[in-house]
Amino acid sequence: MAYRIFAVCIGVLMMTGLARPQQVLAYEDSEIVYSEVAGKLGQSDEAAWLTEAILYAGDLYGVDPLLLTAVMEAESGFSMNSLSPVGACGYMQLMPDTAASLGVDRYNPLENVLGGASYLRTQMERFAGDGDYGLTEAVAAYNAGGGAIEKYGGVPPYSETISYVGRIGEIYRGLLALAED
């Protein structure tokens, strides 16, 4: 119901010139993103906030919000409290050096999402290729680092990274299928 009201509000804002077309496109993905996030967190204020943060970060950095959703789900299961054994933390599992290089506070929920989106965009630009190939390399770089991708000329032979790329591909394809319905 809330998203139906949101749609009417966006329509009014578009008619008055206060909303951009990209915001309307983001709305089309918002129900899918919210459904995926709420599937893990339940229908909650956090799920609604996180959906908006994903849409905002996707718009800001030019990253498909469905891809950001897939990365976040694989990285942290949508938990800001997630901490990896190697020290990555938050929704997007930012490492200390990565967060510092991006100029974000990885313990701040919004900055964590924005930092992850920015880093993913950087990897997408760095490993741009034809279609899925470039995206696969970018996702692998998000996990293993760009140096590993360059060293091996593609996805490195690390079992964790191979599994990670497969997991994100599976989630992302599922979200894209929902968007096509």
Feature roles, as predicted:
Residues 1-6:
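Bacterial N-terminal signal peptides that target proteins for export
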Residues 24-181:
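Catalytic glycan-binding domains that act on GlcNAc-containing polysaccharides
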